[in-house]
């Protein structure tokens, strides 16, 4: 199976990396090298990998916070380093992991800060700016909280506000570092679904770093897989899942990663194999069933069996 590790041609609407190396200068530390990725519109990309693999470093380099150690990043054919800070702020918006403390600002005022690249130093909102703020509040489902103080919101609501602020910048690219890191499970699902919908419906390229591997596979259009001392690979979720890459990239201190349960576990003693003949649309259901390990019995089957299952 082949994955995207080639040099891409420059597309008019793409953010592209060519032979990119990322890391730090003092002292010089290379985190990952020879990165060749192509980020297109209307797609949600999720970067996954173990701790310390370079997910945040890649995001910070793509957004211009860190300089590449080698190679190039281009946006619509223009090298990233050639963008002025003001022009870059109309191209890429960032949502960081840690939410800021803004005790004196309302939700509306926080979202309106996203218009700063267009309003200038004094931040005077024109009628068109106000219309943008109103629209993005509606888009993320937080308009009913517009007059409330930001610090009075739940963590999930605060994250929606920060996403709305990023949308108010009206940039084609939105980068988020662990956007669901401190949220409960229902809120994590809601945020990831929201981002997937925004990317598809608003013609955005959204790039997320995340430790939530199951949700990444559920929502992403493309997975970017990173691990220390391994090449960065990318592919659609089904390709990555069907390969052995998850087990290889997430191996930790000799513990094997279970791609069905998305967790580390003790290796089970195998009985005789059973082949399940199932229609393709039932594959996710069977994978979920296998991950529960309910099929394991104390006495292995006496012979291999074929079990046909129809939808």
PLM regions and their residue ranges:
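Conserved ABC ATPase "signature" region
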Residues: 127-145
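Conserved ABC transporter NBD signature motif
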Residues: 71-79, 88
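The feature captures the beta-strand-to-loop junction immediately N-terminal to the Walker
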Residues: 48-50
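Catalytic Walker B motif of ABC-type/P-loop ATPase nucleotide-binding domains
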Residues: 174-178
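Conserved ABC ATPase signature
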Residues: 149-153, 157
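A short, flexible loop at the N-terminus of ABC-type nucleotide-binding domains that lies
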Residues: 3-17, 21-34, 41, 46, ...
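Helix-to-loop junction immediately C-terminal to a conserved catalytic motif
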Residues: 63
């Amino acid at each position: 199976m082949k994955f995207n590790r080639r040099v891409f041609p420059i597309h008019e609407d793409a953010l592209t990396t060519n032979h990119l190396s990322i890391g730090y200068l003092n002292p010089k530390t290379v985190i990952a090298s020879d990165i060749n990725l192509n980020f297109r519109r209307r797609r949600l990309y999720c970067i996954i990998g173990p701790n310390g693999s370079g997910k945040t470093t890649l995001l910070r380099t793509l957004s211009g916070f860190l300089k590449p150690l080698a190679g190039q990043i281009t946006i619509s054919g223009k090298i990233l380093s050639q963008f002025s800070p003001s022009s870059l702020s109309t191209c890429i918006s960032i949502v960081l992991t840690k939410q800021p403390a803004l005790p004196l600002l309302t939700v509306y005022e926080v979202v309106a800060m996203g218009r700063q690249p267009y309003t200038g130093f004094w931040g005077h909102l024109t009628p068109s700016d106000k219309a943008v703020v109103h629209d993005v509040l509606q888009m993320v489902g937080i308009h009913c909280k517009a007059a409330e103080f930001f610090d009075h919101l739940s963590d999930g609501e605060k994250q929606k506000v920060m996403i709305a602020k990023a949308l108010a910048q009206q940039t084609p690219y939105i980068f988020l570092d662990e956007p669901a890191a401190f949220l409960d499970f229902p809120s994590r699902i809601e945020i990831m679904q929201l981002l997937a919908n925004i990317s598809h419906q608003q013609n955005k390229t959204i790039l997320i770093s995340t430790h939530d591997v199951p949700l990444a596979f559920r929502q992403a259009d493309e997975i970017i897989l990173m691990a220390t001392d391994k090449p960065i690979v990318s592919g659609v979720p089904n390709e990555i899942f069907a390969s052995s890459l998850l087990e290889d990239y997430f191996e930790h201190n000799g513990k094997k990663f279970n791609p069905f349960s998305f967790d580390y576990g003790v290796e089970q003693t195998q009985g005789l194999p059973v082949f399940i003949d199932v229609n393709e649309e039932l594959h996710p259901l069977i994978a979920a069933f296998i991950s529960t390990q309910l099929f394991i019995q104390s006495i292995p089957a006496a012979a291999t069996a074929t079990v046909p299952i129809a939808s």
